[in-house]
């Protein structure tokens, strides 16, 4: 999971960027944090997709019959 402090820092840098007051070091930091965030997001998203199972309507119907509560 991505660290909340890093996400807060990304948002802080984004706000400063909108105001047009980012230094060169802050631009580099922003890019590094963004890259790390996107890598984490993509990995998590891929793992979620890997756990998805596509079923036919018949399989779904059978599943629902077997799992009535």
Curated annotation (Swiss-Prot):
Keyword Protease in annotation: no
SUPFAM superfamilies to which the protein is assigned, alphabetical: YnzC-like
Keywords recorded for this protein, A-Z: Cytoplasm
Gene Ontology CC annotations of this record: cytoplasm
Domain of life of the native organism: Bacteria
Localization per Swiss-Prot or TrEMBL: Cytoplasm
Keyword Cytoplasm: yes
InterPro entries: DUF896
Database matches in HAMAP family: UPF0291 (MF_01103)
Similarity field: Belongs to the UPF0291 family.
Protein name: UPF0291 protein CD630_10710
Naturally occurring in which organism (per UniProt): Clostridioides difficile (strain 630) (Peptoclostridium difficile)
């Amino acid at each position: 999971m991505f660290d909340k402090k890093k996400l807060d820092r990304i948002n802080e840098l984004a706000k400063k960027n909108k105001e047009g007051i980012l230094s060169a070091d802050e631009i580099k930091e922003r890019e590094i944090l963004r890259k790390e965030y996107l890598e984490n997001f993509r990995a998590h998203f891929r793992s979620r997709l890997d756990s998805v199972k596509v079923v036919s309507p018949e399989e779904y119907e059978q599943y629902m019959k077997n799992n009535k509560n």
